[in-house]
Amino acid sequence: MDKRILVRLAIYPIAYVLWGGLMWYSQIITPLDVTNLLLKLPLCNKEFYIFLQSLPNIVIEFFKIIYLYGFSSMIIGGIAYYLFIKRDFLKSDIILIDLALGWLFAGLIYTFVVVKSPFQVGVAKDLINMHYFWIFTKPTYEIPSLHTAYSFLLALHFKDEKPLNYIYFALAILIPISTLIMGMHWIVDVITGVLYGYIIYKFPKTIHIKISKALDFLAGHIKPCILCGKCKERETHEK
């Protein structure tokens, strides 16, 4: 197996564990709870969630599957597609780093400002037993919705990959809807999540490229001098 793949198979899980562990820096201070302000906005009320959660059971179960498995499949499948099938290591690195940066910046927001989820304030029911996921997330991680942001982000990364782009854009629509039906997020979370995903997608990729080259260096794919970018050998190598 290509050493570049082996290096990434070793680094990616470590990055994921660190990504999940970063949630604990939000415990440093007591954040400002703005849930009451959000409850005054349109569609942020019990009537809206009663309507959503009274949909036919088959619809509820469908969106439960989308919430639990569609989201993780987008992320794991997206990275695996570029890593194993396309063998586009830079692209797989960019996606992972985008996800990490998305969590880092959102985590700063969650540290200072929180909003309780609909089921926490009795506006909706928790249809997925959220407490099973609290090792890597919390029900106060609401604005922006990372489920929405990441699904939209992945869809943008796959926009030129036909026919997979149709699947990814479909999931980018279904996943935000599932967060509402499951009682996990507010409509405001979804809207801000879309905007946040777009911002992360457009974020300059300078650091992404440097990290990707560092991983290639660890795999022995490039020589040390290539990292500096000041010699002609790099140009020859990249051609």
UniProtKB/Swiss-Prot annotation:
SUPFAM superfamilies cross-referenced by the UniProt entry: Acid phosphatase/Vanadium-dependent haloperoxidase (SSF48317)
Keywords from the named record: Cell membrane, Membrane, Transmembrane, Transmembrane helix
Coiled-coil residue spans: none
UniProt membrane topology term: Multi-pass membrane protein
One GO CC term, this protein: plasma membrane
This protein's record includes keyword Membrane: yes
InterPro entries referenced in this protein's UniProt entry, alphabetically: Aur1/Ipt1, P_Acid_Pase_2/haloperoxi_sf, P_Acid_Pase_2/haloperoxidase
Membrane-spanning intervals of the chain: 9-29, 65-85, 94-114, 167-187
Record localization: Cell membrane
Protein name: Uncharacterized protein MJ0662
Organism: Methanocaldococcus jannaschii (strain ATCC 43067 / DSM 2661 / JAL-1 / JCM 10045 / NBRC 100440) (Methanococcus jannaschii)
